[in-house]
């Protein structure tokens, strides 16, 4: 049985809550001192992992739509993508404010150059910014065929973001590896499309 438009609306509400409630918990945990000895790092990692989870969830929508034969599921993709951008922005802000500090924000440029994993992160964020700004129907109509070409860059983010995470951790743990494997599986599912996109 196919999902109805009303059921999709309730699903979207649930997804909004699933993406928002971790932010409530983050503020609570930070205010109550629930993080470990290095709360700045913990907050950065938490926001980064949330962005990655939502990135993978965004990429999962199309396979689920086709495998489950639920065409209306595609309506959830944009909200997941926008939440991914929101959490990626929180990740960038947490690094800028908690790692560098307001007085040292001028060092951000040199940090991006001297630390390649940060370069991958900022490139990913800039792509997500472009996708978020053009995610609305008005932008889609204005860009025409170029809209799809632009939004295919989400696949580049799916490559760069897991590498950014793997590269940033000092001690390799299963978590970043699992995110990378998830991205590989979702990209492999799109092998033909990726090959065509790469050739254009």
Curated annotation (Swiss-Prot):
It is a multi-pass membrane protein. The chain crosses the membrane at residues 8-28, 54-74, 79-99, 116-136, 153-173. Its cofactor is FMN; heme b. One of its GO terms (biological process) is protein repair. The keyword Transmembrane applies. Keywords: Cell inner membrane, Cell membrane, Electron transport, Flavoprotein, FMN, Heme, Iron, Membrane, Metal-binding, Transmembrane, Transmembrane helix, Transport. The keyword Hydrolase does not apply. Belongs to the MsrQ family. Heterodimer of a catalytic subunit (MsrP) and a heme-binding subunit (MsrQ). Part of the MsrPQ system that repairs oxidized periplasmic proteins containing methionine sulfoxide residues (Met-O), using respiratory chain electrons. Thus protects these proteins from oxidative-stress damage caused by reactive species of oxygen and chlorine generated by the host defense mechanisms. MsrPQ is essential for the maintenance of envelope integrity under bleach stress, rescuing a wide series of structurally unrelated periplasmic proteins from methionine oxidation. This is Protein-methionine-sulfoxide reductase heme-binding subunit MsrQ. The gene is msrQ.
